[in-house]
Every structure is written in C-alpha cells, then in structure tokens.
C-alpha cells in the first residue's frame, strides 16, 4: 500500500535505519515494532496504554529479539523488507480497507500485530487479555467517527490529550499551587458555566492579577468536590497554543488539529471544559489566503453550546481583538478580574508561603510578606499585584538559597588570609640568612593558627548546611504527607486519614519545630536562611535602582539637618530650602498625600541665584547622584504641537511608537527630580498636561497608558517678576517675610499662569538677589571644587583672603547673579593652574597657595609631604 500516515512513514524509515545500523540483512516486523514503540505519543502506543499493556516489558522483549538477529559483513547489499514484514503490512492494509480508511495508520498495524503469531509480540499479547474484536471496538470508540483520510489524520486523534493539559489531573497530583482568595471570581465563573446558554466565561484583567489562577482554583475545587452537581467529575483542559501551531507545515493542518481538539471536547458530552489562556491569540491564528482563523472555527461550537470554554485575556487585548468581532464577543460572558487590595495580596502570599519555603529551603517571615506587597505597590508601578509581590518573594528566597550554597564571607576571608601567609612564607624560605629564621617560625605559627580557625569555620558551615538541608527534606516530606491525607480523604480511606492526621503529620511537625529551634539557637550563624523585609528591600533596589532601605538612624539624622546639607551648595535662599526640606521629610516618613507627587514647587527669581543648583542638590541628596534629575528646557516647547514631545505623538503620526520624553522618562525612573526650566516660555497646552500630573499624580500618554508620577518631585523655574523682586529687595534690604515678597510678584504671576495652575502648586518660592556675604560663600564653594579636582592628582590647593575678595568683587553682577563668578574662576584660576601643570611647574605631592599680586592671580609652590 502506497498511502501511509505520517507516523507510519516515519516509523518505517526508522526501521530501515535501525536495520542498517545494526548490520541486519532484513528489515523485520521487530524493527518496525521497535521504531513504533520509540514514539510514546503515537496512536499505536496510546491504544496499548488504553488496554493497560506494559510498554516497558514489550520494549525489552523486542530488544532481546533484535540482539539475536544475524548480522552481515559490512559493505554487502542494503537491508530489504523481510517476507514476514511484507505480510504484516498486507494484513494492516486489509484492516484499513475494512474500516473504510484511505491511509494506513498505527491502529491498523496494531490490529495486524495482534493477529500475528510472530514472537515476541505473540507472547506479550497473552499478558494483556484483550481479543482483537475488543481491540477493534476500542479503536472505533477512540476515533469518534473519524476516518484516516489524510496523512496527518492519525496525529489529530486524541487531539484533546495531545494539544491540551488536563488541569484536574495536575490538581489531583498536587502539582498546582494553592489558590488563595478570589472566591467571588471563582463563584462567578461557576455560575456562568452552569448557565444553559452563553455558558462561556471570559476572564478579563490586567497582566498578573490572577486570571490563570482562577482556572487553577476551579480545577482544585472540582477535585475537592466543592462545586455544584453540574460541574462534579468534569475535566478542565488548558489549550496549548504552541503545541497546536508548532509543526503545522501545510495549509489546513492547523485547522485540522484544532478541529480534533473541538471534536474531543464535543465527544465528551459536556464532561470537558476547555480553558484558553490568552484567548485573543486565536483571532487571526492560522489564517492565510482563503483560510479561516481559529476564532471562526470556535464560533459554531460556542453557538451550539457543545463547547464549554473559559477564556482569559487582558483588557487591552479584549478591546483590540475580541470586541471588534461582535459575533465572537457575544458568545462569551465577561468577568472582570481586578487587582487585589494590599490586605488581600498579603493574604494570598500567606497561602503561598509554604510552597516557596519548601522549594527554596528557607523561612519567609511575616514582615517579608508585608514588605513585598507594600514595596512592590509603591515602587514597581508598571506591574500588578499579586504577581509582582510573589516575584519579589521568589527572588529574595532564591538569593538566600544561592548564598547557602556559596562560600560564606568569613571562610572566604580566612582562605585569602591563609593564601597571603603561605606566599609570604615561601618568599622568606628563599632567604638563606639566619636573621630570617625566627620570622619563618613565627610565620608557620600564624599559618597553623589560621588553618585551625578555618577548619573550625568549615565544620560550623557543614553543620549549618546539614541542618538547613535536613529541615528542607522534612518540610518536603510533610507536604507529601498532607497531600496523601487529602488523597485518602477523597477516596474515603479513613484509616489512612486517621494515621496521617493524628500520628505521622504531628510527629513530623514536631521534628521540624525542634530542628528550627536548634538552628535558631546557634551562636554566630554563618548562613542566613530567613527572608526578611530588609532582603525584600534589597531586591526592590536591584530591580528599580532606587535605594529602598528601611529608614536608618543615620538617614533620620540626615533628614533632620537637611537644610544644612542643602546650604552647603545653595547660598542665600532660606525660604526655598526650608519649604523643600519640609516637603521631603513629610514624604520620607509617609505623611505626604499618597495620591499626589512628592512636591510641586515654582522657583521664582532672577538668573544666577541658585534655582537650578537647588534642583541638582536635591537630586543628589535624594538619589545619590545628580543624574537622577530629569531636566526639560521649556524653550523647546513654545509651539502648540510640541506637547506631543512630552507624552508622545498621536496615532498615525511619526514617532507614535517611540513614546514621549516625559512619559518614558518617568516610566523608567519613577523616583526622580523633574525640572521644568523657564516654565513661562512653554505653550499653554503644556500647562494643561501638567494640571493632571500635579493634581492626581498620573500622566496619560498618547497610547492611553497611565504613568505613575506620585514618587517624583516636580520643580519649575521662572524669571517672572524678577525685576519687581530685585527692586523690592534693593528698597527693603534684608528680607524676612516671604508673603510680602510674593505679594510683589503676584500680579505678574496671574498674567502668565491660570488660577487652576497656580492652585495646584504646593509652594511658590521666591529666590532673592544675592548679597556680598553670599558671594563670598559661593567663592568658597567653587574654589573647593577646584581643590577637590587637584587633590585627585595628589596636589593640595589653598588660597588667601585677597583672592576671595578679588573674585567676589569682579565675579558678581546683580543682573546676572553668580554665573559670571564661575566664568571668572575658570579664566583666572583654572586656566593658570592648567598651564602650570602642563609646563611641569606643579607636580603631584606639591602644595599650591593662591594669592593676588597687582590684580593678577599668582601661586606659590612648595613640597607637601602630607599629600
């Protein structure tokens, strides 16, 4: 027969290959049997499993028979089919014809083998106790009316088992995580499944909120019998789209596979429920020119009610794919799955804690669970609970597990110390002088001492590792006993339940308790096997780059003296520094409004008085680097259309996929200082965008994605009213009343900004012109920066009062602020020092003292042994 199914063709090729490699002259039915048994998912093997045949026993018998086959000398004729194999194929051909099939498949071969008297199959067949007629009935039932009318038809039989995973079987075997909470959603799913029509629930929710977990929870309830009568003994299958599509080479093959799955569900007569995760992938899947996509194949079965289906997808994909197809949408009943509250998320983590403790062999504290939920909610804003909190716990536990398997730091340090001593000892041995003899003896004593300490540390390490490993094994055993108890209760084996519940489990729990106490009572532990909130904070810091640590005493002290820290960089602006410091303190202790940004400030004042410098100082103080400041020069946003630069271009315009500069920056670095420089130069459309940010702490970009801005500090600088401010300060001298200063610039502010914009600003901070004393302090700050750069080259720099007086007089202009001072230092000091360095007049190890001589900066050089 020329027409073989793909599986049989492949088996025949392997049989010929096997005979060739084994140097056999003939390809016998045993070669074919061996190649058929090598594919446990084939129809041939599936039928044998259904009649409870022992595949392992048959494989061993075939291997023995093949070893007894005579071999030929290499280089002789190619192996040819034996007469017995030809007769077997002829018998299989007759079976196919009698069943009305066009292609010879694995079940036809099995029927032919069953009627054969050839060994070893004939002997093995007697162990099965099934007649050929009963076998044929089983195959007919298995086929569910399908005929072998294409080469791939055999693969598509039992499509449900091949392309789906049985969740209820996994639940019965204890391979699913417990599903905590979500009772309302599971109850709603059961309610929809129990309807007469439109009984297909669609779980819709953001990624990571637990849609798949609801399907797993339903499978667990079915196994436990905690479902209505209409759902008892049902099987929940999850469709594997990857397996369904993979390897579908020819047109129509994908549709054929999907139809086989649907046929399997329909043939179960309501006993099977199909769960399709990421159901939107079905829309368009498999569609080519003239072919239907998978969704269209589902519609008739969904409409008739023969397909019981649960779908799961995200809200965006539902709107993009499902809602567009009204015929598909109406066949599903939406169930919205929302993100759990913080309390519910902690409750979910408590239920999962034991699974992760057993897997990683660590202990997870209650504080770690709370920290995982709170910190992930606060700092990881682009993902959803409980998924992100579970990931934190998992990664923190894996970190501890990795440390347990690695060399502890004290042992590593001792080994390094020992290596250094041995190297030193070898160097001393090379010296033959008697003076070194005593030092060599001392070195040997030190090496012996370190070796003893190292041996003691290694012994402690091995003991601790043994205790931790033993504890993990006991917890694994406890989990197995609890699963066995549930299984015994399901099968009504109450003697076994009593033995487990009142004897074995309490005994093992007591052993675990004693082992934990023994581990906790050890002094000077080398290994940490506990996941706590500090470790969770460390993982969050690794993920986000934000220094998330519990507030230490050192940080508390730093926050209390925040004004002094800022005044080291920004001089003469007490109003601004005090207001900003108060805002940061409130945010750090958690008393600021959680629904708004950390702070929104408008810095007003003339140029060069420290507005931008204060923003840089804040970024360095809060996030340890000036680069944490995101700066926008608002002169680039003077046109109406330039607002798209901030939030992204609208659909259809160039740059739509790239996103906006503000939205993308805040998405990647939600903890930042955002500076809008010269805000008054921006177009009014920009202010409308800022209203939403300042009020709700949310920015919606052009793709309708919400960006969390609640952890950013927003600072705007402006020169509005700077002339009025300067005139007022000149007239009044020392300024002590901030409100009086603001009343001077209020009219100018109202001309530029709308009332609703001004109303959303936390504080408007006037920056007053600098005084002579302020300029002297700034000279000191700028000169210290130059001195620090020279100190890196081992050069000490000092200066006298004459230089300070010269720079403060020549470098300050009330119209330009302190910026000319920086230029003057660059011209008069830095340029002169750089020339001296290039000439070799100044070298590392020298001290340079700057002074003035007839309005010229000069320096004295002397050797500086201290540097």
Swiss-Prot record:
GO terms for MF: ATP binding; ATP hydrolysis activity
Gene Ontology BP annotations: cellular response to heat
Ranges for region C-terminal: 770-867
SUPFAM superfamilies per the UniProt record, alphabetical: Double Clp-N motif, P-loop containing nucleoside triphosphate hydrolases
Binding annotation for ATP 1: 205-212
Keyword annotations from UniProtKB, A to Z: ATP-binding, Chaperone, Coiled coil, Cytoplasm, Nucleotide-binding, Repeat, Stress response
Localization in the cell: Cytoplasm
GO CC entries: cytoplasm
PROSITE patterns from the UniProt entry: CLP_R, CLPAB_1, CLPAB_2
Location of the region described as NBD1 in the Swiss-Prot/TrEMBL record: 158-339
This protein's record includes keyword ATP-binding: yes
Region (Linker): 340-545
Binding residues annotated for ATP 2, in chain numbering: 605-612
Region span, Repeat 1: 4-69
Residue span of region NBD2: 555-769
Pfam families, per database record: AAA, AAA_2, AAA_lid_9, Clp_N, ClpB_D2-small
Residue intervals of the Clp R domain: 1-145
Coiled coil location: 390-524
InterPro entries (alphabetical): AAA+_ATPase, ATPase_AAA_core, Clp_ATPase_C, Clp_N_dom_sf, Clp_R_dom, ClpA/B, ClpA/B_CS1, ClpA/B_CS2
Family in the record: Belongs to the ClpA/ClpB family.
Subunit structure: Homohexamer. The oligomerization is ATP-dependent.
Domain writeup: The Clp repeat (R) domain probably functions as a substrate-discriminating domain, recruiting aggregated proteins to the ClpB hexamer and/or stabilizing bound proteins. The NBD2 domain is responsible for oligomerization, whereas the NBD1 domain stabilizes the hexamer probably in an ATP-dependent manner. The movement of the coiled-coil domain is essential for ClpB ability to rescue proteins from an aggregated state, probably by pulling apart large aggregated proteins, which are bound between the coiled-coils motifs of adjacent ClpB subunits in the functional hexamer.
Task performed by this protein: Part of a stress-induced multi-chaperone system, it is involved in the recovery of the cell from heat-induced damage, in cooperation with DnaK, DnaJ and GrpE. Acts before DnaK, in the processing of protein aggregates. Protein binding stimulates the ATPase activity; ATP hydrolysis unfolds the denatured protein aggregates, which probably helps expose new hydrophobic binding sites on the surface of ClpB-bound aggregates, contributing to the solubilization and refolding of denatured protein aggregates by DnaK.
Record protein name field: Chaperone protein ClpB
Gene behind this protein: clpB
